[in-house]
UniProtKB/Swiss-Prot annotation:
Positions of disulphide bridges: none
Record key words, sorted: ATP-binding, Cytoplasm, NAD, Nucleotide-binding, Nucleotidyltransferase, Pyridine nucleotide biosynthesis, Transferase
A GO biological process held by the record: NAD biosynthetic process
Localization terms from the record: Cytoplasm
Annotated NCBIfam families: arch_NMN_Atrans, cyt_tran_rel, PRK01153.1
GO molecular function: ATP binding; nicotinamide-nucleotide adenylyltransferase activity
Known EC number: 2.7.7.1
Reaction catalysed by this enzyme: beta-nicotinamide D-ribonucleotide + ATP + H(+) = diphosphate + NAD(+)
Name the record gives this protein: Nicotinamide-nucleotide adenylyltransferase
Residue spans crossing the bilayer: none
Amino acid sequence: MGRAFYIGRFQPYHYGHQSVLKRIAETADEIIIGIGSAQLSHEVNNPFTAGERVLMITRALAHLDCPYYVIPIEDIQRNALWVAHVRSMTPPFDRVYSSNPLVVRLFAEVGISVESPSMYERETHCGTAIRELMLNGEPWEDRVPPAVVSVIREIDGVERLQQIAGSD
């Protein structure tokens, strides 16, 4: 079974991520969840801090029947070194789950097994669509687990996103 690695920006964490992690939990002994672009926040495409994303994921997965670690991973500007950077920040793992073509390629080049899970209702359950709903003041809460709704409300996440998207 082994230890699996799954990386995403989780801006915000949503049911698409939840679906993939539940499937990974069926075959893994442990899961490492990497919060990619951890240094980014307070931007339209990256409104939430790494700590806020840790909170979203941890609360949403409270009942997951598989041990997991949530680890923020900052970007580096050299793709050829990125896998080594990830490995230096995480416990060892033997399997990667990602649908990102660059992530798939980089891990495959160093001989790590990569699986590309299909995303749950990708068109509606993606961070871009959810942030767009938030920006437009439209309902978004049905796209994320209730625990994530609570975190976003607790941090005034929608107001933050709308404010940073405003123009002077």
